[in-house]
Amino acid sequence: MKFNLIFVCLLFSIISICYGNINFSEKIHEKSLVKNQNNSILQDDEIEIGYIIEKFPWCHASMEINYSIESVIAVIKDVENYYKFFDSLSLSKQNTDDVVHIRIDMPLPFSDRDYTVVFDEVVDGNEILYSYKAVVSKDFPEMKNCVRLVNAQGEWYLYEMDNNKTYVRYTWNGQMLGDFPKWGYKQAWTRQGNEIISCLAKEVERRNYDQN
Protein backbone atom coordinates (compact mmCIF):
# COMPACT_ATOMS: atom_id res chain seq x y z
CA MET A 1 0.00 0.00 0.00
CA LYS A 2 1.16 3.51 -0.66
CA PHE A 3 2.45 5.47 2.35
CA ASN A 4 1.36 8.86 3.36
CA LEU A 5 -1.45 10.81 4.81
CA ILE A 6 -3.17 13.49 3.05
CA PHE A 7 -5.51 15.98 4.24
CA VAL A 8 -6.00 18.09 2.94
CA CYS A 9 -2.45 27.43 3.40
CA LEU A 10 -1.56 29.63 5.61
CA LEU A 11 -0.16 30.72 8.98
CA PHE A 12 0.38 34.41 8.81
CA SER A 13 0.06 36.91 11.60
CA ILE A 14 -0.68 40.47 10.46
CA ILE A 15 -1.06 42.31 7.19
CA SER A 16 2.47 43.73 7.20
CA ILE A 17 4.16 40.40 7.95
CA CYS A 18 6.09 39.17 4.93
CA TYR A 19 7.39 35.92 3.48
CA GLY A 20 10.36 36.97 1.39
CA ASN A 21 8.99 39.97 -0.52
CA ILE A 22 5.32 38.91 -0.21
CA ASN A 23 2.86 40.99 1.82
CA PHE A 24 -0.29 39.18 2.90
CA SER A 25 -3.59 41.03 2.76
CA GLU A 26 -5.74 41.68 5.81
CA LYS A 27 -8.69 39.92 4.17
CA ILE A 28 -6.68 36.73 3.67
CA HIS A 29 -5.13 36.93 7.12
CA GLU A 30 -8.54 37.17 8.80
CA LYS A 31 -9.66 33.92 7.13
CA SER A 32 -6.49 31.94 7.77
CA LEU A 33 -6.41 29.07 10.26
CA VAL A 34 -3.31 29.79 12.31
CA LYS A 35 -1.97 33.21 13.30
CA ASN A 36 1.16 32.20 15.20
CA GLN A 37 4.38 32.35 13.17
CA ASN A 38 6.59 30.58 15.74
CA ASN A 39 6.68 27.23 13.97
CA SER A 40 9.25 24.43 14.09
CA ILE A 41 11.01 23.59 10.83
CA LEU A 42 11.06 19.95 9.68
CA GLN A 43 12.64 20.59 6.27
CA ASP A 44 14.33 23.68 4.81
CA ASP A 45 14.72 22.90 1.12
CA GLU A 46 12.99 23.64 -2.19
CA ILE A 47 9.90 22.44 -0.36
CA GLU A 48 9.82 23.97 3.12
CA ILE A 49 7.94 21.99 5.78
CA GLY A 50 7.14 22.96 9.35
CA TYR A 51 4.58 22.67 12.12
CA ILE A 52 3.22 24.37 15.21
CA ILE A 53 1.38 22.75 18.11
CA GLU A 54 -1.76 24.60 19.20
CA LYS A 55 -5.17 22.97 19.75
CA PHE A 56 -4.13 20.75 16.85
CA PRO A 57 -0.73 20.13 15.23
CA TRP A 58 -0.84 22.54 12.31
CA CYS A 59 1.57 21.53 9.55
CA HIS A 60 2.56 23.44 6.44
CA ALA A 61 4.49 22.86 3.23
CA SER A 62 5.40 25.56 0.72
CA MET A 63 7.11 26.00 -2.63
CA GLU A 64 7.28 28.31 -5.64
CA ILE A 65 5.75 26.74 -8.77
CA ASN A 66 6.76 28.02 -12.21
CA TYR A 67 3.24 28.39 -13.55
CA SER A 68 0.46 30.96 -13.30
CA ILE A 69 -1.89 31.17 -10.35
CA GLU A 70 -4.76 30.24 -12.70
CA SER A 71 -3.02 26.99 -13.65
CA VAL A 72 -2.31 26.09 -10.03
CA ILE A 73 -5.76 26.84 -8.59
CA ALA A 74 -7.41 24.88 -11.43
CA VAL A 75 -5.66 21.73 -10.22
CA ILE A 76 -6.34 22.42 -6.54
CA LYS A 77 -10.06 22.89 -7.21
CA ASP A 78 -10.30 19.65 -9.19
CA VAL A 79 -11.20 17.76 -6.02
CA GLU A 80 -12.94 14.80 -7.67
CA ASN A 81 -9.70 13.86 -9.42
CA TYR A 82 -7.41 14.16 -6.38
CA TYR A 83 -7.02 10.38 -6.23
CA LYS A 84 -5.54 10.42 -9.73
CA PHE A 85 -2.61 12.72 -8.97
CA PHE A 86 -2.05 12.70 -5.19
CA ASP A 87 -0.19 9.44 -4.60
CA SER A 88 -1.62 8.43 -1.24
CA LEU A 89 -5.29 8.99 -2.03
CA SER A 90 -7.48 6.07 -3.06
CA LEU A 91 -10.79 7.98 -3.21
CA SER A 92 -12.02 11.52 -3.79
CA LYS A 93 -15.72 12.03 -4.46
CA GLN A 94 -18.02 15.06 -4.33
CA ASN A 95 -21.79 14.97 -3.81
CA THR A 96 -24.46 17.43 -4.98
CA ASP A 97 -24.08 19.45 -1.76
CA ASP A 98 -20.37 20.02 -2.54
CA VAL A 99 -19.26 17.76 0.30
CA VAL A 100 -16.03 15.99 -0.62
CA HIS A 101 -15.12 12.53 0.68
CA ILE A 102 -11.40 11.71 0.64
CA ARG A 103 -9.77 8.42 1.63
CA ILE A 104 -6.08 8.00 2.42
CA ASP A 105 -4.34 4.73 1.61
CA MET A 106 -2.23 3.78 4.64
CA PRO A 107 0.50 1.14 4.85
CA LEU A 108 -0.10 -2.07 6.75
CA PRO A 109 -0.67 -2.56 9.64
CA PHE A 110 -2.38 0.84 9.92
CA SER A 111 -6.02 1.47 9.09
CA ASP A 112 -6.83 3.84 6.24
CA ARG A 113 -7.98 7.36 7.11
CA ASP A 114 -10.81 9.31 5.54
CA TYR A 115 -12.59 12.62 5.97
CA THR A 116 -15.56 14.57 4.62
CA VAL A 117 -15.13 18.31 4.07
CA VAL A 118 -16.51 21.36 2.32
CA PHE A 119 -14.30 23.92 0.56
CA ASP A 120 -14.45 27.71 0.59
CA GLU A 121 -12.59 30.22 -1.59
CA VAL A 122 -11.45 33.77 -0.83
CA VAL A 123 -9.85 35.88 -3.58
CA ASP A 124 -8.14 39.18 -2.85
CA GLY A 125 -6.17 40.71 -5.70
CA ASN A 126 -3.27 38.41 -6.52
CA GLU A 127 -3.94 36.12 -3.53
CA ILE A 128 -6.23 33.09 -3.18
CA LEU A 129 -7.15 31.16 -0.04
CA TYR A 130 -8.87 27.83 -0.74
CA SER A 131 -9.77 26.25 2.59
CA TYR A 132 -11.66 23.19 3.82
CA LYS A 133 -13.21 21.97 7.07
CA ALA A 134 -14.82 18.76 8.25
CA VAL A 135 -18.58 18.24 8.01
CA VAL A 136 -20.93 15.30 8.54
CA SER A 137 -22.79 13.98 5.48
CA LYS A 138 -25.32 11.15 5.30
CA ASP A 139 -24.01 10.42 1.81
CA PHE A 140 -20.63 9.41 3.23
CA PRO A 141 -21.10 7.31 6.40
CA GLU A 142 -18.09 6.04 8.32
CA MET A 143 -16.46 3.01 6.70
CA LYS A 144 -15.27 -0.26 8.17
CA ASN A 145 -11.49 -0.51 8.76
CA CYS A 146 -11.11 3.23 8.19
CA VAL A 147 -10.48 5.94 10.80
CA ARG A 148 -12.65 9.03 10.23
CA LEU A 149 -10.67 12.25 10.76
CA VAL A 150 -13.45 14.26 12.37
CA ASN A 151 -11.24 17.35 12.86
CA ALA A 152 -9.88 17.49 9.31
CA GLN A 153 -9.16 21.06 8.29
CA GLY A 154 -6.68 22.86 6.10
CA GLU A 155 -6.09 25.44 3.40
CA TRP A 156 -4.19 26.32 0.27
CA TYR A 157 -2.70 29.79 0.05
CA LEU A 158 -1.61 31.03 -3.40
CA TYR A 159 0.25 34.24 -4.19
CA GLU A 160 0.80 35.37 -7.79
CA MET A 161 4.45 36.35 -8.22
CA ASP A 162 6.36 37.96 -11.08
CA ASN A 163 7.55 35.98 -14.11
CA ASN A 164 4.50 33.68 -14.18
CA LYS A 165 5.34 32.05 -10.83
CA THR A 166 3.04 31.14 -7.95
CA TYR A 167 3.95 30.79 -4.29
CA VAL A 168 1.96 27.89 -2.81
CA ARG A 169 1.57 27.13 0.88
CA TYR A 170 -0.54 24.20 2.12
CA THR A 171 -1.56 24.03 5.77
CA TRP A 172 -3.30 21.05 7.34
CA ASN A 173 -4.30 19.54 10.67
CA GLY A 174 -1.71 16.82 11.25
CA GLN A 175 -3.84 14.93 13.79
CA MET A 176 -4.06 11.25 12.75
CA LEU A 177 -6.15 9.61 15.47
CA GLY A 178 -6.63 5.85 15.68
CA ASP A 179 -3.70 3.47 15.75
CA PHE A 180 -0.95 5.72 14.37
CA PRO A 181 1.98 6.03 16.85
CA LYS A 182 2.82 9.50 18.13
CA TRP A 183 6.55 8.92 17.55
CA GLY A 184 5.91 8.64 13.81
CA TYR A 185 4.07 11.94 13.42
CA LYS A 186 6.98 14.17 12.37
CA GLN A 187 8.21 11.70 9.77
CA ALA A 188 4.68 11.33 8.42
CA TRP A 189 4.19 15.11 8.26
CA THR A 190 7.43 15.50 6.33
CA ARG A 191 6.47 12.78 3.85
CA GLN A 192 3.01 14.23 3.50
CA GLY A 193 4.26 17.75 2.87
CA ASN A 194 6.72 16.58 0.23
CA GLU A 195 4.11 14.45 -1.49
CA ILE A 196 1.31 16.94 -1.64
CA ILE A 197 3.43 19.82 -2.98
CA SER A 198 5.45 17.71 -5.44
CA CYS A 199 2.34 15.94 -6.75
CA LEU A 200 0.60 19.28 -7.21
CA ALA A 201 3.58 20.71 -9.11
CA LYS A 202 3.79 17.63 -11.37
CA GLU A 203 0.08 17.76 -12.19
CA VAL A 204 0.19 21.48 -12.99
CA GLU A 205 3.16 20.85 -15.28
CA ARG A 206 1.46 17.87 -16.95
CA ARG A 207 -1.72 19.80 -17.72
CA ASN A 208 0.18 22.77 -19.12
CA TYR A 209 2.32 20.44 -21.26
CA ASP A 210 -0.79 18.73 -22.64
CA GLN A 211 -2.28 22.10 -23.60
CA ASN A 212 0.81 23.16 -25.56
What are these regions (language model features)?
Residues 88, 114-163:
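Hydrophobic-ligand binding "helix-grip"
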Residues 72-73, 82, 119, 168-170, ...:
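Hydrophobic pocket/interface hotspot
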Residues 78-123:
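Mid-length scaffold segments of soluble, non-membrane domains
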Residues 141-148, 174-195:
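A short acidic/glycine-rich loop-to-helix N-cap element
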Residues 203-212:
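Short, highly charged C-terminal tails/helix-capping segments
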Residues 4-14:
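Sec-dependent N-terminal signal peptides
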